[in-house]
From Swiss-Prot:
Part of the 30S ribosomal subunit. Forms a loose heterodimer with protein S19. Forms two bridges to the 50S subunit in the 70S ribosome. Signal peptide: none annotated. GO terms for cellular component: cytosol; small ribosomal subunit. Pfam families: Ribosomal_S13. Keywords: Ribonucleoprotein, Ribosomal protein, RNA-binding, rRNA-binding, tRNA-binding. This is Small ribosomal subunit protein uS13.
Amino acid sequence: MARIAGVDIPKNERVEIGLTRIFGIGRSLSNKILKETGVEPNKRVKDLTDDEIVKIRSEIEKNYKVEGELRKEISMNIKRLMDIGCYRGLRHMANLPVRGQRTRTNSRTRKGPRRKIMKKK
């Protein structure tokens, strides 16, 4: 297993797919990284040389925010919205949909399960 950005990448996966295991790297970014480092995308992770792994690792560390650093930035952005009290921040605080979806029906994922209300007798 190759370890890149703190993530173990399975040996038998293709490199372009294996890199997508890292939070913040999708297929297009994975292909871009491999093109910049000169590594064949269809190569299996087990066939990579140590030099190629070091190239990929240094390219990611140098140019991209991934894993913990990216998660921290996202959470800080949400916290900033909540601190300034803007509409999006208020929606985050209330655990409601942030991007304008309807809430009269739907939005159960964001609101959580329905709460039971006792019937009047």
